[in-house]
């Protein structure tokens, strides 16, 4: 996953073209409120301090309607001047017939801005991975989708 419940900020490099920065998650981390507040400051400094930041991805569990934390994080990211790309994780845990219903629940629950992208994704089956990388390549790296 790209955002998770650990205190570390990890950086992943893709073919010398970009860095993917994995910031601490907020959901189920078993840390103090004080530490969560420190994470918030870290994330805010990163969002405002990075001159090369091109996109923000918000990972949300597709199995559930957006939580209060999901809504708060989405609104906060928008308030920081970004329209995050929503990655709806754990796709492999849903029946195929439930996917569109849950995507709609995410869109409605978060009151997404027009044009916000929601990509269902499974780390287990890799479903949605190509769609994410194609979006990154075309929208943020200025490439076509052919490899």
Region annotations inferred by a language model:
Residues 30-41, 68, 97, 101, ...:
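Residues at secondary-structure transition points
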Residues 1-8, 12:
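Single conserved hydrophobic/aromatic residue that forms the stacking wall/gate
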Residues 18-40, 63:
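Switch II (G3) loop of P-loop NTPases
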Residues 12, 89, 132:
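Residue-level signal for inorganic ion chemistry
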Residues 44-116:
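Conserved C-terminal guanine-recognition region of P-loop GTPase G domains, centered on the G4
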Residues 15, 24, 63, 91, ...:
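Anionic group-transfer/hydrolysis microenvironments
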Residues 94-147:
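Canonical P-loop GTPase G-domain recognition
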């Amino acid at each position: 996953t790209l955002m998770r419940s650990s205190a570390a900020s990890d950086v992943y490099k893709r073919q010398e073209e970009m860095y993917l920065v994995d910031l601490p998650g907020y959901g189920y981390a078993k840390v103090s409120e004080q530490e969560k507040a420190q994470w918030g400051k870290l994330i805010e400094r990163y969002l405002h301090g990075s001159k090369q930041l091109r996109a923000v991805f918000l990972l949300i569990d597709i199995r559930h309607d957006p939580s209060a934390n999901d809504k708060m994080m989405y609104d906060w990211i928008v308030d920081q001047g970004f329209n995050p790309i929503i990655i709806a994780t754990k796709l492999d845990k849903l029946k195929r017939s439930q996917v569109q219903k849950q995507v709609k629940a995410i869109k409605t629950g978060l009151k997404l801005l027009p044009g916000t992208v929601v990509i269902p994704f499974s780390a287990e089956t890799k479903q949605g991975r190509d769609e994410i990388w194609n979006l990154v390549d075309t929208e943020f790296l200025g490439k076509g989708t052919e490899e």
